[in-house]
A protein has these predicted regions:
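Long, contiguous internal "core" modules enriched in hydrophobic/ aromatic residues
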Residues: 1-313
Length: 313
């Protein structure tokens, strides 16, 4: 049965019935109008509820939920800034490695033989990559002036031009389907990262990129795929459940670990400092939110700040 539409007064009453403290209905109406009930309440209520009664813990206010929402909003902005930096590096490294091997003709990246065709699935995936994600840029008019310029003036769109218009998801797929020598050339750009490890990172980072781009809840997001085990998992003594590391595989800390390997050291230190500042601010501003709860949901071990104390290899 579909959930019924609720007016703002009904939404406020529903929250009060669940033990949320609201003393100013007019201010609460403005808040719900600005953020939207589903995005704000459904997205961020869990940390404030009693797991047994499903009601809000005593003293929880609408401002507490808004504070967590704003933390996540700022976390998305910070994360996306550095995701774009990694993305830019991967674009450059991929186009250079591919064109060094196969040349500047657009026919090179449209040729299935220039990808890894090993296995039952790869040939089909390569064909899908070419026909759905690469060829349309050449056979249809696009919104990218630089692509149209190369088509009309030069009759050729080299990969180093096209690659800027590709989504991070397509870029990740191109890496996954690349020949081993191309993957090796790209992974060498990053200290201590092997080909398979980079592929798993790109797959996970793509999911986080989509969460940021679509304003979804980020801090507690988990991907279905894992990043590969890394030396830092062991060096930081991340606890294990059997052979599986508990933290840093498909949670936000997996993204932090990936950034540690894929960002220049100076940039990672800046990112880490800004991240720590955000978490500390969220802890100070939210009386109902224990910092340990937030870190747990983000997949952070207690010693996460020591990530830069260890060598990456």
């Amino acid at each position: 049965m579909p959930k019924p539409f609720l007016t703002y007064p009904q939404q406020i009453q529903k929250l009060k019935d669940k033990n949320l403290t609201i003393t100013d209905n007019a201010a609460a109406t403005i808040t719900l109008h600005h953020y939207g009930y589903f995005a704000l309440i459904s997205g961020y209520k869990d940390l404030f509820k009693n797991p047994t009664t499903k009601d809000y813990r005593d003293g929880t206010t609408l401002d507490d939920i808004v504070a967590l929402y704003r933390f996540d909003e700022q976390l998305r902005e910070l994360t996306l800034r550095y995701l774009l930096q990694v993305e830019r590096h991967i674009r450059s490294a991929y186009s250079y490695a591919f064109c060094s091997q196969f040349g500047e003709s657009q026919n090179s990246y449209l040729d299935a033989n220039n990808y890894n065709l090993m296995g039952r699935i790869n040939p089909r995936e390569v064909q899908k990559l070419i026909t759905r994600h690469l060829q349309p840029f050449l056979s249809h008019t696009t919104d990218y002036p630089y692509i149209e310029h190369h088509k009309q003036v030069h009759g050729n769109v080299p990969l180093w031009v096209l690659i800027n218009a590709l989504t991070f998801g397509t870029l990740s797929k191109m890496y996954a389907l690349a020949q081993s020598k191309i993957q090796a050339a790209i992974s060498k750009e990053f200290v201590g990262v092997r080909e398979k490890q980079l592929g798993s990172m790109l797959e996970v980072l793509t999911k986080f990129r989509n969460v940021c781009a679509h304003n979804e809840r980020l801090f507690s997001y988990n991907t279905k795929n894992d990043i590969s085990d890394l030396p830092l998992h062991k060096k930081m003594q991340i606890p294990q459940n059997g052979q599986q590391y508990i933290y840093g595989k498909h949670d936000y800390f997996a993204l932090v670990l990936s950034f540690r390997y894929l960002l220049p050291n100076k940039d990672f230190l800046t990112y880490k400092a800004q991240l720590a500042k955000l978490i500390d601010k969220a802890d100070r501003e939210n009386r109902q939110l224990a910092g340990t709860d937030l870190l747990r949901l983000m997949g952070f071990p207690e010693n996460w700040k020591k990530i830069t104390a260890y060598k990456k290899v």
